[in-house]
């Protein structure tokens, strides 16, 4: 089976990736690459599975509370490409009722949507009473990817930054619990994951030309992310950053971060606990 995009990711790896990135991948091609991570080794599978099972029971309790009380929860999943957003969302909802917990993953705007107020197409997908909406990417496309690739003007982006605090304030004032998660991953581990996807026929669908083109724009992404997080972090709608080089630890931290936002009957505080502060915190840890 041929490689997607004519093997462009492999070509970047061999011809254009920084030497330290290539060295890290050569040293640990199966990963995860944890060179700058707070832990030297991936979390043991048995420990991960035990904690995940207990946390998924807590998510079921949360779902029952949401349905019974009409609570509305919106969780925004953002992050670097290949940071594990989709896998984390999967672990959130795999034991939940899809009528209660639904994923919102919008494609690029249509011509009609592009002519509307920027936030308009997202409003229709906010949760109704008794729903949890999981946004696999969100309105923050304008702050990062649209800026990096020139899909919006500087004026449009500046207008977005002016409006996003007010938009999120309205969401919260309406009674919706808003949780914003930023999943981050190091450059070597990101490229290793891309190479893995490129070679695996079952994962190739995850790749896009944005992923390929973005490989050469790491620094531009870094600057855009830094500005976006610092500008849109607020007491009303704070960012929770999860360092996701170890997917197992990251998934557990993300689930705990959401469960911490809602009180529900039968909550097991020993299980929910506090997200691991070594990998989960505010914007100050995003590029640590």
Question: Which ranges hold each PLM region?
Answer:
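Glycine-rich phosphate-binding loop of ATP-dependent small-molecule kinases
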Residues: 1-288
């Amino acid at each position: 089976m041929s490689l997607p995009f004519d093997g462009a990711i492999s070509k970047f790896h061999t011809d254009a990736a920084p030497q330290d990135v290539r060295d890290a991948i050569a040293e640990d091609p199966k990963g995860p690459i944890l060179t700058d991570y707070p832990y030297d080794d991936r979390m043991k599978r048995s420990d991960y599975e035990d904690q995940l099972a207990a946390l998924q029971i807590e998510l079921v309790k949360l779902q029952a509370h949401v349905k019974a009380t009409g609570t509305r929860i919106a969780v925004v999943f953002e992050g670097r490409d290949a940071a594990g957003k989709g896998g984390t969302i999967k672990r959130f909802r795999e034991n939940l009722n899809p009528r209660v917990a639904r994923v919102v993953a919008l494609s690029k705007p249509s011509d009609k949507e592009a002519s509307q107020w920027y936030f308009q197409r997202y409003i229709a997908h906010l949760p109704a009473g008794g729903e949890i909406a999981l946004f696999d990417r969100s309105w923050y496309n304008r702050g990062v990817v649209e800026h990096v690739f020139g899909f919006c003007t500087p004026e449009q982006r500046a207008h977005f930054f002016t409006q996003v605090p007010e938009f999120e304030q309205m969401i919260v004032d309406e009674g919706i619990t808003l949780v914003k998660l930023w999943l981050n991953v190091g450059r070597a581990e990101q490229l290793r994951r891309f190479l893995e996807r490129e070679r695996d026929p079952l994962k190739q669908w995850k790749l896009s030309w944005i992923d390929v083109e973005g490989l050469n724009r790491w620094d531009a992404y870094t600057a855009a992310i830094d500005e976006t997080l610092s500008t849109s972090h607020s007491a009303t709608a704070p960012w929770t950053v999860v360092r996701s080089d170890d997917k197992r630890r990251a998934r557990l931290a993300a689930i705990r971060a959401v469960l911490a936002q809602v009180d529900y009957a039968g909550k097991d505080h020993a299980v929910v606990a506090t997200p691991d502060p070594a990998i989960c915190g505010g914007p100050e840890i995003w590029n640590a």
